[in-house]
Amino acid sequence: MCGIEKKRKARRDGAVGEALAAEYLRKKGYEVLEANYHHVHREIDLIVQKDDCVAFVEVKTRSSDAILEAPLAVGRRKQMFLFSAASRFLAQKRVGDCEVRFDIVWVETEGADMHVVSHIEGAFTPFGG
């Protein structure tokens, strides 16, 4: 598979993984507020709410033989982009007083099959957690 085909497949897998993650979160009682929220060159895969908590979710779709663990797949630079976009979303939508959290949903591919492996609530914080 050439580089362009790999990128297309990765994009396709990412979109399917995000849809799967959204469905998984809905089943856990979350309301999906936004999918693929864009601000400047920043994107948040999913923004969900449950009770008084808004979670900004990064979805990572990887093959089952991937070595990288989910929390390590979101580097500090990406986290900073997420924090910036989240701040913009909160200001734009005038979200009231609520808990804000940054989560990761890890989706694994095995051949043609995909499934959610884990949902890590509070995977990282603006303060380096």
Language-model regions: role of each:
Residues 1-35:
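Acidic-basic catalytic patches of nuclease active cores, encompassing PD-(D/E)XK
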Residues 36, 60, 103-105:
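Solvent-exposed beta-strand sheet faces enriched in polar/charged residues
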Residues 32-34, 56, 102:
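Hydrophobic residues on conserved beta-strands that form the core of alpha/beta folds
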Residues 92-129:
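Domain-level recognition of nuclease-like catalytic cores that cleave nucleotide substrates
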Residues 39-42:
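Short acidic/glycine-enriched loop/turn segments that link adjacent beta-strands
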